[in-house]
């Protein structure tokens, strides 16, 4: 009875079977001609192609242009909008002002910077300039403004203040007359700039009109004081320009007051005294000869 019940229970149970998956061999043909997914990559054409490997054909282009590379045919397309490069900021300023950009500035404006629209012919950066004119005139300066605003500096009482504060001081240098009324050579004309560190630099020489004007003023002053360009100038007139005190040399003695040179007898007396002193200090031994 028990065996029959077991067979009935087994018949009522449903047997679940696992699905069998189809097995495929894991073999790939690694050929160098085409990749694994060649169909997917070939279906995406480039922007200048209608289909992969087929460039776009244009009715306006000739047969010679159609036979050229796809890049040139795409660039000559009338339907495409070409994007040009943007102008630099300094050219944008010209367009805003209503000017044309047909003629660009010369490369000299590189010194003024990319955003500077000034038309200055000289660079406004600190520099040292040196120029030699004539036989003895030498000029040079350390200045940031070459055109120069040194005319506005005061001469006189501000000289000591400028030297103490470390700034440049402008001193008017006459250099007309020397000692005893003789005319000395003027090596430095115009103005002289004094800087700290015991460096002396004469001023710049781009002022020919200024020098000529100074020459005329000096000539007028010479005529006003009563002398001309000749060298026959009195010492009183030269003292107007150079305050020089010449101390007189006083003679404190003469050749008669000098002691007379010692005679030969005094010399011999001196050496005898020296010899006597040496004999007292150094013991002298007399050599006795034995017979």
From Swiss-Prot:
Residues 28-43, 59-78 have a biased composition (Low complexity). It comes from the Eukaryota. This is Uncharacterized protein At4g00950. Pfam families: DUF688. InterPro entries: DUF688. It comes from Arabidopsis thaliana (Mouse-ear cress). Residues 1-82 are annotated as: Disordered. GO terms for molecular function: DNA-binding transcription factor activity. GO terms for biological process: embryo development ending in seed dormancy; regulation of DNA-templated transcription. Transmembrane segments: none annotated.
């Amino acid at each position: 009875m028990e065996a029959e019940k077991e067979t009935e229970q087994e018949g009522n149970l449903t047997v679940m079977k696992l699905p069998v998956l189809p097995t495929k061999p894991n073999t790939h043909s690694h050929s160098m001609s085409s990749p694994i997914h060649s169909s997917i990559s070939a279906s995406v054409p480039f922007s200048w192609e209608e289909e992969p490997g087929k460039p776009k054909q244009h009715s306006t282009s000739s047969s010679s242009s159609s036979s050229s590379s796809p890049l040139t045919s795409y660039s000559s397309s009338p339907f495409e909008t070409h994007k040009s490069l943007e102008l630099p900021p300094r050219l944008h300023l010209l367009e805003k002002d209503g000017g044309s950009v047909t003629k660009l500035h010369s490369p000299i404006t590189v010194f003024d910077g990319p955003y500077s629209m000034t038309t200055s012919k000289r660079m406004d950066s600190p520099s040292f300039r040196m120029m030699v004119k004539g036989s003895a005139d030498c000029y040079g300066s350390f200045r940031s403004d070459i055109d120069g605003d040194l005319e506005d500096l005061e001469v006189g009482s501000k000289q000591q203040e400028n030297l103490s504060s470390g700034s440049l001081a402008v001193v008017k240098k006459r250099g007309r007359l020397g000692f005893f009324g003789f005319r000395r050579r003027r090596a430095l004309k115009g103005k002289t700039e004094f800087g700290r560190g015991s460096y002396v630099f004469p001023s710049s020489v781009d002022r020919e009109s200024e020098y000529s004007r100074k020459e005329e003023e000096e000539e007028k002053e010479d005529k006003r004081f009563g002398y001309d360009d000749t060298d026959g100038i009195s010492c009183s007139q030269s003292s107007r320009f150079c305050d020089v005190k010449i101390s007189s040399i006083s003679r404190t003695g003469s050749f008669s007051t000098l002691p007379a040179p010692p005679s030969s007898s005094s010399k011999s007396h001196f050496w005898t005294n020296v010899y006597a002193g040496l004999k007292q200090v150094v013991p002298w031994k007399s050599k006795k000869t034995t017979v």
